[in-house]
């Protein structure tokens, strides 16, 4: 009997050991699978060496080990306080050390030891109740990968699906639905290996009648009540999931808030813009506290996951903005949405819930059935209104307009390095799976997750200056088509202004007319020394300024400057050899030639400076260079030609239907002349390219 009992004990122990080993093996297998998915998604982002270096520089953990000088300084301070070689025998007692000190000025608090800077993304997911578990799981995996790459997300759940659901159910049922969807998001992130937490008590709402001063951007009725409810999980790598509900400040009544107001409140909190300070506080104390808040966290990204996708654009045949330079394009994009939505410049009303009291406006109900005839992210193919003709009401534009306003308001509160991304749930859930389509021609690319790609490169998945036919999606063997549709994702930055001389809105760029004065580089509007520095810094070559001015001053078509001379382009009108200058046919046969295209070295590969300049050329200056040949130029050209008997390549953007034999010969003649004469003012080594421009 004892033998039988001991045998059973050994058998049970062996079985338990096997189960533990099996569990450990399964855990290791799962961890390896997660690592594999993670590395595949990162490698699939196709970041260049320059982009990878920039990412590592921004997201590498700080060196927290104390330096030798700091250790010596601390030692000297202790020895001074204790006396020379006396140790701690004669140190001041605790009572003396903590006794009040009478000083004339307030004693500033000692700064707390700095921890690593938290890089945060603010994510808003709209209408998660419309998403199946697989898509939501994919979004959870993406947010988990962002966290592993150093970008921790704070997620706001928006239950507004555009229907009249909140009018047909009670407020309690609505809140429960939003919390239920927030719990689904938590479960999706937890399943991906990253911890998430539901935080439904962090948003406060100022009540009606309270002594409250509303300030655009800087103050709102919706605010964060306790910062540590956000920062504690973020420091531990836990993702806070916040439903769009809040508590009133005085009565602590649970009410619903618009998700956009919650996003703005979180933005203000992370940016350290609004915190409850006493009017009696010393300004230096306030300054120290704000600096401490801003050194603790950096809000790097605003990510809007919306069933409708990015911001639509009527001037792009693919239908969407790829990149929005908010400083330059916000008003144009806003007016375009108003026209397409049939709003006629009426300010949009935000859809809200009735229980939000008089602080919020209840918008007109928008039936989901009114815009679900198209798949999420698709737009109506009907053309935009022309010549002031009334457009049919499109309720989808209301959501796009709110997203555009939210992006602008958020980026206005953040440093220029911050950016925003608007994409569809399908794109946000995209991982390393094989793409359903492939791009065509020289622009062939693998399908990428826009969130991962944007974190590593600070760029959109596709360049905004690429011709539509290079963007995909289409089969490799399918011809390039101007009607090509692609993933509706919009990347936005606060950006920079673009200055064009002369302004094409008032003075269209046209070939010079005899007797009419032309713009020159010595014009007072143009800062010639800064322009020369831009060209020399970009090409790392010295420019013969006087020789260059003699050649171009009578032939300048225009100058484009991005920001504070961070990038620019100079275009000239050129004649094919053999055509007499000043003749009747000379003006008709003049070729628009991209003479210089330059970007400061510090701005190359980031910020979209080159795309901003290039897009201004083809869109604003010619609506409807002497540089090394690279893929960037090849991708943006309609076609290229290797010039015979030279080491030059000609690029041109003229559509095939507008290219007759004579125009093509004129292009070729001008480019051959420039290639042989090298009239650019300095020499370039290796392969070379010349760009001629025409209407898109």
UniProtKB/Swiss-Prot annotation:
Superkingdom of this protein's organism: Eukaryota
A Pfam family assignment: NAT
InterPro entries recorded: AceGlu_kinase-like_sf (IPR036393), GlcNAc_Synth_fun (IPR011190), Vertebrate-like_GNAT_dom (IPR006855)
Function, as annotated: N-acetylglutamate synthase involved in arginine biosynthesis.
Domain N-acetyltransferase: 515-676
Organism, as annotated: Sclerotinia sclerotiorum (strain ATCC 18683 / 1980 / Ss-1)
Protein name per UniProt: Amino-acid acetyltransferase, mitochondrial
Catalytic activity: L-glutamate + acetyl-CoA = N-acetyl-L-glutamate + CoA + H(+)
UniProt keyword list: Acyltransferase, Amino-acid biosynthesis, Mitochondrion, Transferase, Transit peptide
Gene this chain is encoded by: arg2
Pathway recorded for this protein: Amino-acid biosynthesis; L-arginine biosynthesis; N(2)-acetyl-L-ornithine from L-glutamate: step 1/4
Stretch list, region Disordered: 59-84, 371-394
A GO term, aspect molecular function: L-glutamate N-acetyltransferase activity
């Amino acid at each position: 009997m004892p033998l039988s009992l001991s045998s059973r004990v050994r058998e049970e122990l062996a079985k338990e050991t096997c189960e533990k080993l099996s569990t450990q093996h399964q855990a290791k297998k799962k961890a390896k699978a997660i690592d594999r998915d993670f590395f595949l998604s990162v490698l699939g982002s196709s970041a260049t060496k320059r982009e990878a270096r920039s990412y590592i520089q921004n997201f590498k953990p700080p060196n927290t080990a104390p330096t030798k000088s700091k250790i010596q300084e601390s030692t000297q301070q202790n020895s001074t306080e204790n006396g020379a070689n006396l140790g701690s025998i004669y140190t001041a007692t605790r009572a003396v050390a903590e006794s009040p000190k009478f000083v004339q000025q307030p004693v500033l608090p000692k700064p707390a030891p700095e921890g690593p800077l938290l890089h945060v993304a603010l994510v808003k997911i709209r209408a998660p109740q419309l998403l199946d578990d697989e898509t939501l799981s994919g979004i959870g995996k993406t947010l988990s990968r962002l966290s592993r790459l150093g970008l921790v997300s704070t997620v706001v759940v928006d239950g507004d699906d555009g229907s009249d659901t909140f009018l047909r159910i009670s407020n309690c049922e609505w809140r429960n639905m939003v919390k239920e969807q927030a719990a689904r998001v938590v479960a999706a992130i937890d399943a991906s290996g990253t911890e998430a937490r539901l935080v439904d008590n962090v948003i406060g709402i100022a009540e009606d009648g309270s002594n409250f001063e509303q300030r655009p951007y800087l103050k709102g009725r919706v605010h964060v009540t306790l910062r540590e409810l956000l920062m504690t999980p973020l420091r531990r790598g836990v993702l806070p999931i916040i439903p769009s509900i809040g508590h009133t400040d005085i009565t602590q009544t649970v009410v619903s808030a618009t998700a956009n107001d919650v996003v703005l409140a979180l933005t203000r909190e992370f940016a350290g813009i609004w915190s409850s300070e006493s009017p009696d506080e010393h300004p230096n104390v306030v300054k120290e506290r704000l600096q401490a808040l801003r050194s603790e966290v950096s809000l790097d990204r605003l990510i809007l996951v919306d069933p409708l996708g990015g911001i639509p654009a009527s001037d792009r045949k693919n239908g969407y903005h790829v990149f929005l330079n908010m400083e330059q394009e916000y008003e144009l994009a806003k007016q375009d949405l108003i026209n397409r939505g049939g709003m006629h410049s009426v300010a949009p009303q935000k859809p809200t819930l009735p229980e939000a009291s008089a602080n919020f406006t209840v918008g007109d109900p928008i039936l989901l059935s009114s815009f679900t005839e198209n798949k999420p992210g698709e737009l109506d193919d009907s053309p935009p209104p022309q010549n002031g003709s009334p457009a049919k009401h499109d309720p989808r534009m209301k959501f796009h307009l709110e997203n555009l306003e939210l992006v602008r308001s958020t980026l206005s509160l953040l440093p220029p390095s911050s950016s925003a991304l608007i994409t569809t749930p399908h794109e946000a859930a995209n991982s390393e799976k094989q793409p359903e389509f492939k791009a065509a021609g020289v622009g062939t690319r693998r399908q990428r997750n826009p969130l991962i790609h944007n974190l590593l490169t600070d760029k959109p998945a596709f360049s905004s200056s690429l011709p539509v036919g290079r963007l995909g999606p289409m089969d490799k063997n399918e011809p390039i088509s101007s009607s090509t549709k692609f993933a509706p994702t919009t990347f936005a930055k606060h950006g920079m202004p673009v200055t064009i001389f002369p302004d094409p809105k008032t003075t269209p760029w046209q070939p010079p007319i005899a007797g009419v004065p032309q713009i020159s580089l010595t014009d007072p509007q143009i800062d010639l020394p800064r322009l020369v520095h831009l060209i020399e810094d970009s090409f790392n070559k010295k420019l013969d300024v006087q020789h260059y001015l003699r050649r171009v001053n009578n032939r300048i078509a225009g100058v484009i400057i991005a920001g504070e001379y961070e990038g620019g382009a100079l275009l000239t009108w050129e004649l094919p050899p053999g055509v007499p200058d000043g003749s009747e046919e000379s003006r008709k046969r003049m070729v628009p030639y991209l003479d210089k295209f330059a970007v400061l070295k510090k701005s190359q590969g980031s910020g979209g400076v080159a795309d901003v300049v290039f897009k201004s050329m083809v869109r604003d200056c010619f609506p409807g260079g002497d540089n090394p040949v690279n893929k960037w130029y090849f991708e943006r050209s309609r076609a290229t030609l290797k010039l015979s008997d030279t080491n030059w390549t000609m690029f041109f953007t003229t559509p095939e239907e507008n290219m007759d034999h004579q125009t093509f010969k004129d292009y070729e003649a001008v480019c051959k002349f420039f290639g042989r004469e090298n009239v650019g003012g300095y020499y370039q080594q290796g392969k070379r390219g010349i760009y001629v421009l025409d209407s898109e």
